[in-house]
């Protein structure tokens, strides 16, 4: 069960629950992120239209996303609404919850690796990660991408930082996109070949690969985490190598498609 660092949700929060009781006047749902807590959805908060039969809208064991209307910790009451939430908000919140389920599983794997329970993991590191990074998965993702120092920097213990990073790197793969562009490079100097090689080598990196299609055309392949970043890197790489050639009395041009 994914856990929140706070005991109760707050007014306006979007909560994930499982409906466990449906009555004529409303429904009760166990809250997935608040252990032992439940929310009540009155029939008037089920749909914006007239509800003749509440079971046409909610049923037992159904996963729901609802907006918190009122919280009374003294009475143990949470009132929530299904109608005061847009469909895109509902979808995003459910996706977020599923991602956090995966993160909790990674935390559990990390804990077992050092002979600790999930409860101990939350108390010793889980809530700290949530406080520092917003949610558990973000902490694991950053550890996978940047290494254990990102955890050490927020006072995660070396033991936890090491094992969380190991588990993250094994189980989280950063999504990648790849785009391609082409440059035509021509040099009229006696050392023109060396100038072009220098220009192409200047743009090669972990994200940028250069291939010769056939003089004067060269393929530039960019691999990174998203398309806007890839387009920016491709444009900068093409401009850089063309600039070097032109500074040496040559010519260069960039095109996205391989010309016949």
Curated annotation (Swiss-Prot):
Positions of the S1 motif domain:
12-83
Iron-sulfur found in the keyword field? no
Lineage: superkingdom: Archaea
Record flagged with keyword Nucleotide-binding: no
Recorded GO molecular functions are: ribosome binding; RNA binding; translation initiation factor activity
Instruction: Extract the Pfam families matched here.
Output: EIF_2_alpha (PF07541), S1 (PF00575)
Family matches, as InterPro entries:
NA-bd_OB-fold, S1_domain, S1_IF2_alpha, TIF2_asu_arc, TIF2_asu_C, TIF2_asu_middle_sf, TIF_2_asu
Q: Which keywords does the record carry?
A: Initiation factor, Protein biosynthesis, RNA-binding
Q: What does this protein do?
A: eIF-2 functions in the early steps of protein synthesis by forming a ternary complex with GTP and initiator tRNA.
Q: How does it assemble?
A: Heterotrimer composed of an alpha, a beta and a gamma chain.
Kindly give the PANTHER family that the UniProt entry links to this protein: EUKARYOTIC TRANSLATION INITIATION FACTOR 2 SUBUNIT 1
Family statement: Belongs to the eIF-2-alpha family.
- The name on file for this protein is Translation initiation factor 2 subunit alpha
**To which species is this protein native?**
Methanosphaera stadtmanae (strain ATCC 43021 / DSM 3091 / JCM 11832 / MCB-3)
